Amino acid sequence: MKVNCKVLLLAVLAFFLCIDATAQSGAHNAYSPYSVYGVGDIFKEGSAYTRSMGGVGIATRNRRIINFTNPAAVTARDSLSFMADFGVIENNKIFNQTTDAGKFKSANNTFNISDFVLSFPIWRSSAFMVGITPFSDVGYDFTSHETDPDIIGKTGNVTYQSYGQGGVYQFFVGAGATFWKRLSVGAEFIYYFGTIDKVSNTVYTDESYRAINSGYTMQLRGTTGKFGLQYEQKLGSDLSLTLGATYRLSTNMGGYANVYRFATASEVSDTLIFRTDTLRNSGKLRFGDELGVGISLSSGENWSVEFDYLRSDWRKSGFDSYQGTMVEGSSSTFRSTVSQSFRAGFEYTPNRNDIRYYMKKVSYRGGLYFDRQYYCLDPSGRNVDAIGITLGMTFPVFKGNNGITVGLDFGRKGNFKDRSMVGEHYATIFVGMNLHDIWFQKTMYK
């Protein structure tokens, strides 16, 4: 068996970078005012390859990349190949809000590792994959000042601060197999883990009043399963139609939450509340299930188009009543609901095997998406939506199917009818490297 040490070294290096990223604390890996609700912003699953096509992937079959959006897609590969995928992402955001007090504007940018996945064959038409990706991100920092003259006259200036950080990661192990050369099925075991910190402070300029600090630290963990299938039908010598579907089970989250509240004056602190709530099998917090369907049409390795739809039900999540998933002092009523996503994308490669012009070997992609979040605000049920366009290119490197994907995601998040809600404009840059090598080939001697 021939093993490429360079590919193995790059894969190991990427693995330790991911481990280091999941252990970081004290810095935001993501930032959004809307991440104050629930367990934060749900991370869009997929590699740089699928993200550059609007986030599709349920019906994608490409032997050159690892498509971990659908467990059944792991079977689309060379039967003797080892594959790895490593990605990073940078979010650049501008926030706008119009209220009775005026117009407000701010900006933020963050950097995070988006995925690390390994895949290799098991036997004949079956294959295995293992990886880690973010599931949700929390990152926000609010500051406001008391404006009531009666309160200011009694206590002096009062500052309210709220900030949060952390998130949930998902580690997954999956396998798939192909039957009758057309039907592929796959299954995945998912382990959720992560820490979310949410803090609220009230600070008085009058030292005769004690500052109030309160917050929640949640350690979450849980397991679930995901299933997928793909059916590929040839429509001609090069043309093929693929139907795909995925389903992720809902799950009760375990772990614990530390709830605290204390008052400080100078260097002295008095603990007012400190307790630990155990979440194990309590049903207090529950991640919603998710159903996805997709259809794609492709012509060999020249072009492909795809449309996906996803629906996730979070109405029984328990976030509405559990304090640790809210921010103290928030004026908005948070309610879990059903999230939906519509995604469409295309890929075009002029000539993958061209030996004269490098740019003809480059793959060009684009896509559109509309995402409705898993929560709404206020009794009237104001939805939070995201809409955007994506662009991307994959540049072949080294030899074989190795490539580097660079993509952009331009979009807006918020309520498109209500300008009093924060409008989040973003330009996301993502870079992914897919490594491909033949490991399970016997050397022949003459």
Role assignments for model-derived ranges:
Residues 1-9:
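Bacterial N-terminal signal peptides that target proteins for export
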Residues 9-18:
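Bacterial N-terminal signal peptides
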Residues 10, 59-61, 171:
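Short hydrophobic "helix-edge" motifs at membrane interfaces and signal-peptide entry regions
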Residues 24-52, 121-446:
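Outer-membrane beta-barrel porins/channels
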